[in-house]
């Protein structure tokens, strides 16, 4: 049977009606998408304008702009959902009209077509979701880069130099008596020398309440995010155990390797991170990833053991646990102390490993970095078969720049081992050690024995042209990317 419709069959009429209804739905969706794009464009324009405002309002304004962008994204999702609903409604109406006119024999065919349309729509939705996630990530990265660039642009060279240091409260004040309370004297020093981080030790800890108050005050006294760190690998040597404020002994790395495995490593990371977060810390210089090569070495006493592959798996899982508790992990020490011996009393620490030997130990550090470690601590080991002299790795371009930066492609924070060690200050002046570390490619100088002389050494090196401000800005960019990442939604 044929209908009088310009020679068209009933089937052709149904197809044209479906096409018309779908085009109408797509036009509605396109119009909403255009409005959404305009809204997002306005949000991004507001963000860019905000970042260029005066320094005192930059971070707060950036946060407000991000909130506006998030609101726009929510409106986007709602609009897309509404458009999809209208499209489905239009398709349903077309389906009903077809069903009313169709003969019973046509129903299975129409049902199959509709199912194919649903499948195509689901596939398109998944693709659109992936594209949205990618776009959001790119937007977040752009926001973070702008925040970091804005922060650095507003800093004086004195502030920039101070931000390279991660020191104890005693070093900041220039005293030797352990600081157990943080008050006006620390506040004044932090205002004068806005260091990048404060590291605490057992001597700073007298009670759980006092420690929490100290860490809280340190953050209050700083205008910018402050790294507050400690070295805690778990076990009986934890500063929380030795200071007497905790009886909760978390598994040591040696215990993890001997009996607990990857699950135990992750659990230990979670426990360490939870305890650190309880007191307000945000950095743990752990795990110790060195491969043990000699009996009696620090790697043998406190590390995971002699097998690089096992160390890599366990280090990765400890870092995952710490990261899941919002603690920045600082994997240490590269190159490892696994076969090192010290010359005399407090002399240099020597390893006879070659470049090929060292490559066999890369995995634990690289796995920890891949798992989210934000710091890589460079040891004071001297490698004469690699360098040709006894200059420590912490001051060595061959180690930090050639291997870590260029060969590994690592662009996170490189921090020195504690610089108050005799193998450093007996061989180099405080200024020489600080400048040498930055020249070699390090970003932060940890626990210098004399902060004032080290800090002034950096400033003098800039004035003389030995260090450029651009070189310092490279390190600050890495530092502030870590500090500000949590402030950027979606990063």
Regions found by a protein language model. Give the residues of each.
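Short acidic, glycine-rich surface-loop motifs adjacent to enzyme active sites
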Residues: 185-207, 285, 293-297, 369-390
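Conserved beta-strand positions in the central sheet of alpha/beta enzyme cores
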Residues: 166, 199, 284-285, 330, ...
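A substrate-binding/cap region within the structured catalytic cores of diverse enzymes
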Residues: 249-319, 323
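Short, basic, glycine/proline-bearing loop/turn elements
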Residues: 192-204, 257-258, 303-304, 350, ...
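N-terminal hydrophobic targeting/anchoring segments and the immediately downstream early-domain regions
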Residues: 2-228, 235-239
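Short glycine-enriched loops at secondary-structure junctions
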Residues: 170-172, 230-243, 282-292, 331-337, ...
């Amino acid at each position: 049977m044929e209908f009088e419709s310009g020679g068209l069959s009933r089937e052709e009429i149904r197809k044209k009606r479906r096409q018309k209804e779908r085009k109408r739905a797509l036009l509605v969706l396109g119009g909403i998408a255009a409005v959404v794009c305009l809204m997002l464009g306005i949000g991004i324009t507001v963000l860019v304008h905000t970042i260029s405002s005066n320094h005192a309002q930059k971070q707060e304004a950036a946060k407000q702009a991000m909130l506006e962008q998030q609101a726009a994204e929510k409106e986007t999702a709602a609009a897309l959902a509404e458009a999809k609903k209208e499209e489905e409604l239009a398709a349903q109406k077309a389906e009903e009209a077809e069903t009313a006119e169709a003969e019973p024999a046509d129903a299975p065919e129409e049902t199959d077509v509709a199912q194919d349309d649903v499948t195509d729509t689901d596939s398109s939705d998944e693709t659109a979701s992936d594209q949205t996630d990618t776009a959001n990530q790119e937007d977040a990265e752009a926001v973070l880069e702008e925040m970091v660039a804005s922060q650095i642009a507003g800093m004086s060279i004195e502030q920039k130099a101070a931000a390279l240091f991660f020191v104890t409260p005693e070093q900041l004040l220039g005293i030797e008596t352990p600081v157990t309370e943080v008050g006006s004297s620390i506040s004044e020093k932090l205002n004068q020398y806005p260091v990048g981080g404060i590291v605490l030790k057992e001597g700073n800890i007298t009670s759980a309440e006092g420690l929490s108050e100290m860490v809280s005050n340190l953050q209050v006294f700083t205008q910018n995010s402050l790294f507050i760190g400690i070295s805690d690998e778990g076990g009986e040597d934890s500063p929380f155990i030795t200071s007497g404020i905790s009886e909760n002994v978390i598994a040591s790395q040696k215990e993890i390797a001997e009996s607990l495995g990857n699950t135990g490593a992750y659990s230990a990371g979670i426990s360490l991170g939870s305890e650190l977060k309880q007191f307000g810390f945000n950095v743990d210089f752990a795990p110790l990833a060195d491969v043990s090569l000699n009996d009696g070495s620090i790697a043998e006493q406190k590390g995971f053991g002699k097998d690089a592959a096992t160390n890599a798996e366990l280090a990765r899982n400890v870092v995952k646990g710490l990261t899941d508790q919002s603690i920045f992990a600082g994997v240490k020490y590269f190159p490892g102390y696994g076969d090192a011996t010290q010359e005399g009393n407090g002399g240099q620490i020597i390893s006879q490993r070659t470049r090929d030997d060292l490559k066999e130990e890369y995995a634990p550090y690289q796995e920890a970095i891949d798992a989210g470690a934000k710091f890589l601590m460079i040891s004071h080991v001297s490698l004469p078969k690699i360098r040709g002299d006894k200059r420590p790795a912490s001051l060595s371009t061959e180690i930090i720049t050639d291997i870590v930066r260029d060969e590994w492609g690592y662009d996170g924070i490189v921090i020195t081992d504690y610089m108050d060690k005799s193998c450093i200050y007996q061989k180099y002046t405080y200024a020489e050690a600080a400048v040498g570390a930055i020249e070699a490619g390090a970003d932060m100088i940890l626990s210098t024995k004399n902060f004032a002389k080290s800090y002034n050494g950096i400033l003098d090196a800039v004035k003389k042209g030995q260090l450029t401000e651009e070189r310092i800005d490279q390190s600050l960019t890495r530092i502030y990317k870590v500090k500000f990442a949590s402030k950027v939604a979606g990063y």
